[in-house]
Curated annotation (Swiss-Prot):
Residues 462-493 have a biased composition (Low complexity). InterPro entries: FAM83 (IPR050944), SACK1 (IPR012461). PANTHER family: PROTEIN FAM83A-RELATED (PTHR16181:SF29). This is Protein FAM83D. One of its GO terms (molecular function) is microtubule binding. Phosphorylated during mitosis. Keywords: Cell cycle, Cell division, Cytoplasm, Cytoskeleton, Mitosis, Phosphoprotein, Proto-oncogene. Induction: Up-regulated during mitosis. One of its GO terms (biological process) is epithelial to mesenchymal transition. It is linked to Probable proto-oncogene that regulates cell proliferation, growth, migration and epithelial to mesenchymal transition. Expression increased in hepatocellular carcinoma, promotes proliferation and cell colony formation via activation of MEK/ERK signaling. Expression increased in breast cancer; may be a prognostic indicator of poor disease-free survival.
Length: 585
């Protein structure tokens, strides 16, 4: 096997693909895997002997060799047994085993972001991508860029919702105090993921500051690791974390070679890149993946600090207690991220007198003529215009200091009210026309039975009554075509009664006289003229009404955006003059 792998390792560089997908030989080397197992099992001497025997180049420097030996955990060691016990207890506490072929660890649900997270859906636009670079040490002069530490602290202070930190080592006191102050005073949630191998340095800093990170209500500290290599002997090699980025509110991210240490902020040379916009979505996804793979602080590390009595609460803490204390905070956070501010409620200012007076007015409009009604209620309409305008406003609208969106809402409300008033006016005009036509028919019959022997007076009374009927029924009328049809039928009915009355068998003595024949011819001639005059007037009014209705319909459809439906009736007479007599130029 070693000879076969040697042939794979000695593939010339020309066979490797400089572009495109890498070859399998570039991704995996069996000889190097065997050399790594020799290093873990026998140490540096066995590793060097294997390289000489297989004629392999030295692919690990001495520092890497010592780092791998320190990171290796053998099955019989105390640390590996404690870690396995902790994992078993963690899995048994959740009791998520499905009893199928798959192992128990695949059935464990990932930890939740219990402190809240920005409500960005997948693919949501986060703005244009922008890049801002900082270097340590910073440039000379007042106009030089900020240092990495100063730029990072400035970004942390600008957070409003959440801060997510992924770091290898965290020992800077100033940055930790900034995060602690942001949690307590601004109510910003802070997630910290640290390398498991370097977590002891973070706990040493907290012990020196006499700070308990697990007691912070809006701060969570967990550990992550790099890739894990498993040898055939059962030994596993745990990789380190070299990812360094800080996610702020889901819209900005600070990444680079800068670590949260005093030496990187003052002595070491480092850089920091601040990204904003759509590129932050990738860092958002990466942090959620790392948080799902993270683990709480290991009891093994806490045992080293039990002698100082500063972290006793971490050993005996209950995970459920933190969830109970953060329940209300989580609801408030989710509500603030996903909901809009509520508008102030305004009490309707419409008095009860307006409602009480509206009913008798509606009853009178069906029996009294429009001229009398307008003359008796014109002053009252002018006094009630302000009150009706106030009642048309919805109670959810905020009247003082309106914004642009609220003005658009009131415009749509005014449109709905105008459409409501036009529809109800049509019904009132049709009911008045029908009532007056019936009363006119009754008066005409009475005039014929009583005043017909006088001749001239009876014939002159009928056209006048018909004129009054036609004028009262069609003047100031903005109803539909059906209401005008009722007017035409009402005016035509007295004329038909008049023509049949001349042939009534109750008056045979007048048919043979010459004066009666002249009178009949003149009256018929006048009746035809009056009939033509009335028909022409009715036709012109109908044409005018159809034109007015067509223009009004076009206006409401194009400009008001009126929708059909049932509307509530509000003060119809306040806009009657405008609706019935528009000025067309």
């Amino acid at each position: 096997m070693a000879l076969l792998s040697e042939g794979l390792d000695e593939v010339p560089a020309a066979c490797l693909s400089p572009c495109g997908p890498p070859n399998p030989t570039e991704l995996f080397s069996e000889s190097r895997r065997l050399a790594l197992e020799e290093l873990v099992a026998g140490g540096p001497e066995a590793f060097a002997a294997f390289l000489r025997r297989e004629r392999l180049a030295r692919f690990l420097n001495p520092d890497e060799v010592h780092a791998i030996l320190r990171a290796a955990e053998r099955p019989g060691e105390e640390g590996a047994a404690a870690a396995a016990a902790a994992e078993d207890s963690f899995g048994s506490s959740h009791d998520c085993s499905s009893g199928t072929y798959f192992p128990e660890q695949s059935d464990l649900e990932p930890p939740l972001l219990e402190l809240g997270w920005p409500a960005f859906y997948q693919g949501a636009y986060r703005g244009a991508t922008r890049v801002e670079t900082h270097f340590q040490p910073r440039g000379a002069g007042e106009g030089g860029p900020y240092g990495c530490k100063d730029a990072l602290r400035q970004q942390l202070r600008s957070a409003r919702e959440v801060i997510a930190v992924v770091m290898d080592v965290f020992t800077d006191i100033d940055i930790f105090r900034d995060l602690q102050e942001i949690c307590r005073k601004q109510g910003v949630a802070v997630y910290i993921l640290l390398d498991q191998a370097l977590l002891s340095q973070f706990l040493d800093m907290c012990m020196d500051l006499k700070v308990h990170p697990e007691q912070e209500k809006l701060m969570t500290v967990r550990t992550i690791t790099g890739n894990i290599y498993y040898a055939r002997s059962g030994t596993k090699i745990i990789g380190k974390v070299h990812e360094k980025f800080t996610l702020i509110d889901g819209i900005r991210v600070a990444t680079g070679s800068y670590s949260f240490t005093w030496t990187d902020g003052k002595l070491n040379s480092s850089n920091l890149v601040i990204l904003s916009g759509q590129v932050v979505e990738h860092f958002d996804l990466e942090f959620r993946i790392l948080y799902a793979q993270s683990k709480p602080i290991s009891p093994k590390l806490l045992s080293h600090f039990q002698s100082s009595n500063k972290f006793d609460h971490l050993t005996n803490r209950k995970p459920q207690s933190k969830e109970l204390t953060l329940g209300n905070l989580l609801r408030m956070r989710l509500a603030r991220l996903s909901s809009t501010p509520r508008k102030a409620d305004l009490d309707p200012e419409m008095p009860a007198e307006g409602k009480a007076e509206r009913k008798p007015h509606d009853c009178e409009s069906s029996t009294v003529s429009e001229e009398d009604y307008f003359s008796s209620h014109r002053d009252e309409l002018q006094s009630r215009k302000a009150i009706d305008a106030a009642t048309q406003t919805e109670p959810g609208e905020e009247m003082p200091g309106l914004s642009v969106s609220e003005v658009g809402t009131q415009t749509s409300i005014t449109t709905a009210c105008a459409g409501t008033q036009t529809a109800v006016i049509t019904r009132i005009a049709s009911s008045q026309t029908t009532i007056w036509s019936r009363s006119t028919t009754t008066q005409t019959d009475m005039d014929e039975n009583i005043l017909f022997p006088r001749g001239t007076q009876s014939t002159e009374g009928s056209p006048v009554s018909k004129m009054s009927v036609s004028r009262s029924s069609s003047l100031k009328s903005s109803s539909s075509v059906s209401s005008q049809g009722s007017v035409a039928s009402s005016t035509g009915s007295p004329a038909s009664i008049r023509t049949t009355d001349f042939h009534n068998p109750g008056y045979p003595k007048y048919l043979g006289t010459p004066h009666l024949e002249l009178y009949l011819s003149d009256s018929l001639r006048n009746l035809n003229k009056e009939r033509q005059f009335h028909f022409a007037g009715i036709r012109s009014r109908l044409n005018h009404m159809l034109a007015m209705l067509s223009r009004r319909t076009l206006f409401t459809e194009n400009h008001l955006g009126l929708h059909s439906g049932n509307f509530s009736r509000v003060n119809l007479l306040a806009v009657r003059d405008v609706a019935l007599y528009p000025s067309y130029q």
